Amino acid sequence: MAKMSLSSYLLILTFSLFSQGILLSASKSIRNLEDDMVFNTFRLGKALQKEDTPQKSVVAPSLEQYKNDDSSFMNDEENKNSKNTGSKHNFLNHGLPLNLAIKPYLALKGSVAFPAENGVQNTESTQEKREIGDEENSAKFPIGRRDFDMLRCMLGRVYRPCWQV
């Protein structure tokens, strides 16, 4: 009885493993067909665009360079002569192409772009806020001194509570 249940479990296990492999290969081949359909429609659209516009225009890059190696996992035709070259090869060949005409950084706007000009406005607004909130302490200490004392209190280097600053 134990031998029969063990063999039935092994039979179920092998069946499930083989069915997953077949499903995986079928899904990979279906994905390859869908990818090829997308690439063909893109090529057709690009060809029609070239025929319609006689003037010189910027040509969009082909989608073939973005095709993953994962899509050819179970494809025997491509795997016959291929070898594993590692992640460096995949990164260099399937990365985005560099467009050197575009700057690699974003243009900064507002107060971040010119901090020297806006620094005067920022200090004036903070001084107004402090004068409104600390009318009793504004006569005793200059603003820089109050900030320094508050920072020292928050760091814990002065042996007094922060409310005394």
Curated annotation (Swiss-Prot):
Please list the disulfide bridges. Answer: C153-C162
Give the signal sequence positions.
Answer: 1-21
- What post-translational modification information does the record give? Pro-MCH is processed differentially in the brain and in peripheral organs producing two neuropeptides; NEI and MCH. A third peptide, NGE, may also be produced. Preferential processing in neurons by prohormone convertase 2 (PC2) generates NEI. MCH is generated in neurons of the lateral hypothalmic area by several prohormone convertases including PC1/3, PC2 and PC5/6.
Q: Where in the cell is it found?
A: Secreted
Q: Which InterPro entries match?
A: Prepro-melanin_conc_hormone
Q: Which UniProt keywords apply?
A: Amidation, Cleavage on pair of basic residues, Disulfide bond, Hormone, Neuropeptide, Secreted, Signal
* Keyword field contains Signal: yes
Entry similarity comment: Belongs to the melanin-concentrating hormone family.
Q: Could you tell me what this protein does?
A: MCH may act as a neurotransmitter or neuromodulator in a broad array of neuronal functions directed toward the regulation of goal-directed behavior, such as food intake, and general arousal.
Protein name, entry field: Pro-MCH
Name the source organism: Canis lupus familiaris
